[in-house]
């Protein structure tokens, strides 16, 4: 029996990679316009980073992480999200000594042991943005604007932006007390996970996926009634900045996000009832994992989810021309000459290919059609002797006589 890929993973095949290149190129261009610079962090980190940063009571840490002991008996985890590793890199490399704010983006694989379903894999890829060093609500609004603009760049219009303010540790104490009071009378009906969270982190009860727990929590107290003046002012400033960008939003007091590091601003972007992007502010994370107190804000966007959203909205990703020219050959001398010519034309910026399968001339031309070559040429003894050949435009069959000694002429005809 042939070995298959692990459940929840998916191969990116050569005929589909152009979709990813298109998305990554657009997002990189957009990131540059916002003065974001790329960061790359390891695929695995010390488990403690996520336990301290993401939160021990979260679903991610309790149920979804791929954790193992390495040969040095150290607990290692494949990263389930990108923010904590970026924060660790910020501290470890002394980026707090650089001019602030530090603005960064990344493309990264993330790993979560989840139930596999449409749009949800155990390995997926994320575009993430993080900004370290500013407390200003203008940065929150800027990143939300970037995320919304990204979807507009991909022609996805039917979006709903939900925002909330989940306060700071001080004002959350009062809110947690109110949540305990609310859920206490239904405690026996809660799932086992929520019973554990009831004392340690009652806000996580609002993030439970259990149907019964969701039903119990639908009339729970809202955080906006408990936030302190500083958090409230930050939220009002955020709304003012969003209004200045003409970004429509809905205040949803039940958005808490699934990670413990969030403070103040949290947001989600929805398309057809599916969350396609989410993020928020995390002013305490850097200190939690051993750094100097540093405010920060960021978001994550799943690439697989984005591609699925494009498909569901019937938005085609433009397919680039795969091959500029295919050079076929006749005989041993023709094969060597075609091989040399193909490699020479590649130095002129052309996507060029020749026969590597010893096919007949007819089969070579079928292959040229199959790989969608714009032009083709056949090289045999006659062409080698006369130093010229016919360049065929595949679209209409028109042929042009060209000199094999003038590569610039051939390249200019194909690229014009």
From Swiss-Prot:
PROSITE patterns xrefs: AA_TRNA_LIGASE_II
GO BP terms, alphabetized: histidyl-tRNA aminoacylation
Subcellular compartments: Cytoplasm
SUPFAM superfamilies with a match to the protein in the record: Class II aaRS ABD-related (SSF52954), Class II aaRS and biotin synthetases (SSF55681)
EC code: 6.1.1.21
One Gene Ontology cellular component annotation held by this UniProt entry: cytoplasm
Disulfide bonds: none
UniProt cross-references to InterPro entries, sorted A to Z: aa-tRNA-synth_II, aa-tRNA-synth_II/BPL/LPL, Anticodon-bd, Anticodon-bd_dom_sf, His-tRNA-ligase, HisRS-like_core, HisRS/HisZ, HisRS_anticodon
Superkingdom, taxonomy of origin: Bacteria
Listed GO MF terms: ATP binding; catalytic activity, acting on a protein; histidine-tRNA ligase activity; transferase activity
Keywords attached to this entry: Aminoacyl-tRNA synthetase, ATP-binding, Cytoplasm, Ligase, Nucleotide-binding, Protein biosynthesis
EC category: ligase
Catalytic activity of the protein: tRNA(His) + L-histidine + ATP = L-histidyl-tRNA(His) + AMP + diphosphate + H(+)
A Pfam family reported for this protein in Swiss-Prot or TrEMBL: HGTP_anticodon
HAMAP family: His_tRNA_synth
Family that this chain belongs to: Belongs to the class-II aminoacyl-tRNA synthetase family.
Subunit (UniProt): Homodimer.
Name of the featured protein: Histidine--tRNA ligase
Originating species: Clostridium novyi (strain NT)
Gene: hisS
């Amino acid at each position: 029996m042939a070995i298959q890929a692990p459940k929840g993973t998916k191969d990116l095949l050569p005929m589909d990679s152009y979709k990813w290149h298109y998305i990554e190129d657009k997002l990189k261009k957009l990131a540059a316009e916002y003065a974001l610079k790329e960061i790359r962090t390891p695929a695995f980190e010390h488990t403690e980073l996520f336990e301290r940063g993401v939160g021990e009571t979260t679903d991610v840490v309790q149920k979804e992480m791929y954790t193992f002991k390495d040969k040095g008996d150290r607990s290692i985890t494949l990263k389930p999200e990108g923010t904590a590793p970026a924060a660790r890199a910020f501290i470890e490399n002394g980026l707090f000594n650089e001019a602030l704010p530090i603005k960064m983006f990344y493309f990264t694989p993330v790993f979560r042991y989840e139930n596999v379903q449409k749009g949800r894999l155990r390995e997926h890829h994320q575009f993430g943005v993080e900004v370290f060093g500013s407390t200003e609500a203008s940065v929150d609004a800027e990143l939300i604007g970037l995320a919304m603009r990204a979807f507009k760049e991909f022609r996805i219009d039917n979006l709903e932006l939900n925002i909330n303010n989940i306060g700071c540790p001080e004002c959350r104490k009062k809110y947690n007390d109110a949540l305990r009071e609310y859920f206490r009378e239904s405690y026996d009906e809660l799932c086992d996970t929520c019973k554990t969270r009831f004392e340690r982190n009652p806000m996580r009860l609002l993030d439970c996926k259990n149907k019964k727990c969701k039903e119990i929590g639908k009339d729970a107290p809202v955080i906006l009634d408990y936030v302190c003046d500083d958090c409230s002012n930050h939220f009002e400033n955020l709304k003012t900045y969003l209004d200045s960008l003409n970004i429509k939003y809905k205040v949803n007091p039940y958005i808490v996000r699934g990670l413990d590091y969030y403070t103040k601003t949290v947001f989600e972007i929805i398309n057809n009832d599916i969350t396609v992007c989410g993020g928020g502010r995390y002013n305490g994370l850097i200190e939690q994992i051993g750094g100097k107190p540093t405010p920060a804000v960021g978001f994550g966007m799943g690439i697989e989810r984005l591609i699925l959203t494009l498909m569901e909205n019937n938005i085609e990703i433009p397919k680039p021309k795969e091959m500029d020219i295919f050079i076929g050959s006749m005989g041993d001398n023709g094969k060597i000459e075609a091989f040399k010519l193909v490699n020479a034309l590649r130095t002129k910026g052309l996507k060029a290919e020749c026969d590597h399968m010893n096919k007949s001339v007819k089969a070579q031309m079928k292959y040229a059609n199959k790989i969608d070559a714009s032009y083709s040429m056949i090289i045999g003894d006659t062409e080698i002797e006369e130093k010229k050949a016919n360049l065929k435009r595949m679209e209409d069959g028109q042929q042009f006589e060209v000199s094999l000694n003038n590569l610039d002429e051939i390249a200019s005809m194909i690229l014009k």
